[in-house]
Amino acid sequence: MAQRASRRPAAAAAAVVVAVVLAVSGGVGATPETACRAAAEEDRRVDYEFCVSRLSHHHDSPDADTWGLAKVAADVGVCIAGDAAYDAKAKLQAAKAGGEREALERCAELYDRMGSAFAAAYDDINRREYAAGKEKAGEAASLARRCDGAFADAGVAPSPLERQTAESVKIAIVCTAITNLVK
């Protein structure tokens, strides 16, 4: 009987150690703050304040581990792209013919495609195909930059969608950096 009683504390201690190791290695308990801090340490392009602000407001963030927060970043990218496409189309209503109008039309198309790229990144990360997810996030950033390029080519400076482009690129960087943290 004494032998059995002495095994219980050892078994309980072993269970605690296993639980702690699994929690740390799986990212359980990750918060936007800790994930964004780690992402910023990994990639100096990560805007910590932006990262925390955008990820903290997502409904999936409170229960997410690092993998979940990578998906949250991709989903936030989908939302930002959708808002940017809406903004481009709204500005298009008031635009006169010419370079600015053509650039707005081009940007509306690019932002629609960017939303699809972020959605594909989400799906890839969800399937744990991290390289493909990061590639799609990079594609989304490239599409956003092409919007600014459309305005530059039209001789319109600054771009009336400069903020939307900047936020799109920032969330693509965040998505990639957090995905890099997933083990």
Curated annotation (Swiss-Prot):
It is found in: Secreted, Extracellular space, Apoplast. One of its GO terms (cellular component) is apoplast. It holds the Pfam family PMEI. One of its GO terms (molecular function) is pectinesterase inhibitor activity. Disulfide bonds join C36-C51, C107-C147. PANTHER family: OS02G0537100 PROTEIN (PTHR35357), PECTINESTERASE INHIBITOR 8 (PTHR35357:SF2). Belongs to the PMEI family. This is Pectinesterase inhibitor 8.
